[in-house]
């Protein structure tokens, strides 16, 4: 049984998810994980080069399964922050594959050892802000057809809502449209403190915005 909180950060590309996830993990000494295990990073470009949504769906599903085992071990020693998890995989690929993937999601849930987080932090921003942020960073990092492009061309927010409806865990939505990282972090701490009253594993954590 895990001893520490497991927090997943989800959201559209360009919403500020990674910035907020890294800040939260640093301030609270949680272990921070990206979605892809080190062992699979070397084949990501090959998978992306297929331009096959089925291929990327199975690739990220494998990433989730491998990370799940890592999280289960790490949660004995510290809190875990996951920068994307199964929710992204299903929200994005439901759109790319134009299929209802809820059956596959429930199949994962049926695996007794598969971990769901204690809380999901869903980071959003207005579409114009997201478009501008993606445009700014695309000058240095190419737009991914299975990531940034999906955020630009599809209604990913609605897809996320359909996936979130499949689980019974707190979903905290943090809108960064008019917030800098520190402001968003302060709002997040307030929301986490609020739900800690009904989420026992969070009660031992000091969710103060002043944490250094």
Give, region by region, the residue ranges found by the protein language model.
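Phosphate-binding P-loop
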Residues: 1-4
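Hydrophobic anchor at the beta1->P-loop junction of P-loop NTPases
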Residues: 9
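P-loop (Walker A) phosphate-binding loop of NTP-binding proteins
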Residues: 12
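Conserved lysine of the Walker
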Residues: 17
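Hydrophobic positions on the alpha1 helix immediately C-terminal to the Walker A/P-loop
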Residues: 20, 24
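ATP-dependent small-molecule kinase phosphotransfer cores
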Residues: 31-103
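A glycine- and Lys/Arg-enriched "phosphate-lid" helix/loop adjacent to the NTP-binding pocket
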Residues: 92-159
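NTP-dependent small-molecule kinase module
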Residues: 131-212
